[in-house]
Amino acid sequence: MFTASIGVFVFGLLAAIAGGAVGASIGGNYGFVLTGFTVLASWGILAATGSTFALDYLAFGPFMGPHIIFAGGAAAAIYARYKGYMDDGKDVNSPLAGLGRPDVIYVGAIFGILGYAVQIGIAKIPWFGTHTDSVALTVVISGIAARILFGGDPGKGLFKGSLHSSHLYAEGKGLMAKIKPGPNGRWLEWQERPSQLITIGSLFGIFAGGASLFLAANIGAHPTDLGFADGLAAANANNFCFGISAIIILFLITNRNMPVQHHVTNIAGLAAVQFFPVLMGKSFSTFTWT
């Protein structure tokens, strides 16, 4: 996509620099919310025109892709804590432009470059690149890299984070108790219990699976009439509920205990459109959706 030519690659690189900086400026979670809105708008473009351009280049590309805008914001937050500009490196809500420190925004831009390059690299791996979510995997890699690089106490230097500092672990405990997160290390306390996880996972999964099947079978008719592949809508149907889940993060930012389930709706929608054809005695590639 962004490797068609050197010019296209450089254009995407510049967009990734800006995307990471935007994520740092407005806060990683706000950036992710914008991803959600962009996904829904891009789906409207797909339904109207049959083109996945907006999904590929905007929603999941270097402009609003989570591996750029969210990952850049998350890395900048860890860096800001490392430099002593803020108290909590987990704070991916606060707009970091408010710190008045340009270096924080530059870190977001650098991690935008990292996300851009790593995602392209993963996508190019034979077989693996086409059988995994390269955007999501890049978010994980970027977060781990930022944690290792900046995760230490302020002023202690690079690569001296909690992954390296034994004093930050509980002494005299077994392995699991030793690494058990403290009061500030818990992200979603209301989603920790297995009963709650199963409830949210199953019901939001049904929600996303049903919506994805509806989009695949009904919205897909128009792109097919325009001459596009029959399974075009089905191949992107899981993104729709992912976008809704991303927007729900906006309400989480307002200190509401919202369910965080974008990782559920994305996979559930994908599973629905992949396995429904199997139930019909076909495969995804041979099933006729419209």
Protein language model features and the residues they cover:
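Alpha-helical multipass membrane-protein architecture
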Residues: 2-290
